[in-house]
Amino acid sequence: MLNPIVRKFQYGQHTVTLETGMMARQATAAVMVSMDDTAVFVTVVGQKKAKPGQDFFPLTVNYQERTYAAGRIPGSFFRREGRPSEGETLIARLIDRPIRPLFPEGFVNEVQVIATVVSVNPQVNPDIVAMIGASAALSLSGIPFNGPNGAARVGYINDQYVLNPTQDELKESKLDLVVAGTEAAVLMVESEAELLSEDQMLGAVVFGHEQQQVVIQNINELVKEAGKPRWDWQPEPVNEALNARVAALAEARLSDAYRITDKQERYAQVDVIKSETIATLLAEDETLDENELGEILHAIEKNVVRSRVLAGEPRIDGREKDMIRGLDVRTGVLPRTHGSALFTRGETQALVTATLGTARDAQVLDELMGERTDTFLFHYNFPPYSVGETGMVGSPKRREIGHGRLAKRGVLAVMPDMDKFPYTVRVVSEITESNGSSSMASVCGASLALMDAGVPIKAAVAGIAMGLVKEGDNYVVLSDILGDEDHLGDMDFKVAGSRDGISALQMDIKIEGITKEIMQVALNQAKGARLHILGVMEQAINAPRGDISEFAPRIHTIKINPDKIKDVIGKGGSVIRALTEETGTTIEIEDDGTVKIAATDGEKAKHAIRRIEEITAEIEVGRVYNGKVTRIVDFGAFVAIGGGKEGLVHISQIADKRVEKVTDYLQMGQEVPVKVLEVDRQGRIRLSIKEATEQSQPAAALEAPAAEQGE
């Protein structure tokens, strides 16, 4: 009854299996894709009829990781998976971006793609597997889809590109780039890099696109074998007469409106023209559909702007194609934050702060691929007031998570190593105004705020958003695009990096025919823009401040013998707890004996270091210490001599005469000088008050820690 159709092929170092017809047979299409034990089950359901009045394409992509895939039970209170994590949200966006432009214009039926990770090999990331699965399922479904598309991850190790590197290989790689495309065109690039050149990045894109052709060929073969018949869907016929009538009423006026350089004023004028045009047409014929008129007006708007750009005329706000809007750069704008900056580019503005914390502020991420600790956090907030609107304020949306991750990628390559700068760093970008590329403004602001906070970043980084308009062989690359140009162009891409190279590259391409040469021109123009912005930023602050903020915790590092770690921690953590309370510091101990002491006050840190050195000091036989009586027994007394160490003064060693009763000579808590007679193999210490008193040398001052009193 179940007769699965399977295709197997070699993809780089992995074997990929596509299987359909076995599960979820009521879905429009379903595919199980596996790559060396990492398996993702992808389903597609498409509605045959569009909702009446639907004016946009309702595509939903859900990506969900199941912990059973890694043989684990969720650690949450309810012991089941909750809402999508940040990582799942980012992969859902990664699947969505290359498939969205492959649906035909005018197709507004609801489509839902659900990718479920059901098995995971910790060396094979499920994101590429899920992207291949979505492409295969849509191609099999019969839904109008101009695919299939492939997907590949590209690494760069020892000056060689590596296809789909394993997780271990990625740690050695200077690049982590995901590229997706069809047979003829690249559609999407998402990457982070350790400051590689434009040519190296472009080479990786081309390499990934060439290598993924095997995926596309195999999906096509599977479709021949198991594909469902294509839907008989036709786009609505174009009403030429109505288009001409709308153009006659509005085209010239819209062209004039787009010469207004102020965003709010321009929007107001465009709204007036649209509403007047629609009112005029509805007065002539009330059977017309207002939504359809709105769409025609939008298409006219798009053509007005595109044709002006292609004709070499100034852009919407009066700039030439490679001009960047006016920049205003300020640092140290908030008095109590550890680092802050206000970065303004035209009508886009970001208030960015940097906060320093200790290792215990790091985020522990319990991911499917295993647990990891993140010591660099980047959060991006996009409040509705930034575009002059009202709206919900609450937990971050998909877009904010995606933009925050892109900005983080832009900065990650220049962050110092933990051994040189042992702080957890959190950067928050508040977008206070937005008109184009707020994520790249966040990169610039983050670089400034980190320098202001005294974080020794390896270089300043800046980001820029670029656009491309293409008609036939004629194309124009635009630097620093506005929000309006973003929607009207054929490709938009964002590049972040330093003077030396690229740290992050994100591309979204909506058309075919974007060649390697065009991408080369675009990347080189972006480099010029990036260097210009870096020049302006350097006038405000050209190197990290020599010292961190007085309000930031200072971390002092000392080394102790790993065998002594247990002494510093104490029984059940008693010693370290008492130390942190006594000194007002935060103390972290690593397995190799590295001790990090964080304090906002230098004196407190010195006190903590002194106490730890006392605790870890070796007990010297023959030396006299100041001790404190902690326990009295019939045969003598136990005396703490600091460092959590306790020794026995035998009754015969209390005085130089016979002692009948210990309490005649000693009381609990009494401070007495003691001489170390012996430390045996088991670390037990024999002490003498008698010999210490006889000896005239001054006692070595070593106080017992508070935790040891009254034990």
From Swiss-Prot:
Q: What is its EC number?
A: 2.7.7.8
Q: Which residues bind Mg(2+)?
A: D486, D492
The enzyme class is transferase
A molecular function (GO) held by this record is: RNA binding
One Pfam family this chain carries?
S1
Q: What PROSITE patterns does this protein's entry cite?
A: KH_TYPE_1, S1
> Any idea where the KH domain is?
553-612
Q: Which UniProt keywords apply?
A: Cytoplasm, Magnesium, Metal-binding, Nucleotidyltransferase, RNA-binding, Transferase
Reaction(s) catalysed by this chain, per the record, are: RNA(n+1) + phosphate = RNA(n) + a ribonucleoside 5'-diphosphate
Give start-end positions of Low complexity composition bias.
698-711
Q: Which residues form the S1 motif domain?
A: 622-690
Cofactors needed by this protein, per the record, are: Mg(2+)
What is the first-listed, main subcellular location in coarse terms?
cytoplasm
What Gene Ontology biological process does one annotation of this record name?
Answer: mRNA catabolic process
State where the protein is found.
Cytoplasm
Q: Look up the domain of life of the source.
A: Bacteria
Q: Where is this region: Disordered?
A: 690-711
Would you name any one GO CC term?
Answer: cytosol
Family that this chain belongs to: Belongs to the polyribonucleotide nucleotidyltransferase family.
- Subunit details for this protein? Component of the RNA degradosome, which is a multiprotein complex involved in RNA processing and mRNA degradation.
Q: What does this protein do?
A: Involved in mRNA degradation. Catalyzes the phosphorolysis of single-stranded polyribonucleotides processively in the 3'- to 5'-direction.
- Please state what the protein is called: Polyribonucleotide nucleotidyltransferase
Species source reads: Escherichia coli O127:H6 (strain E2348/69 / EPEC)
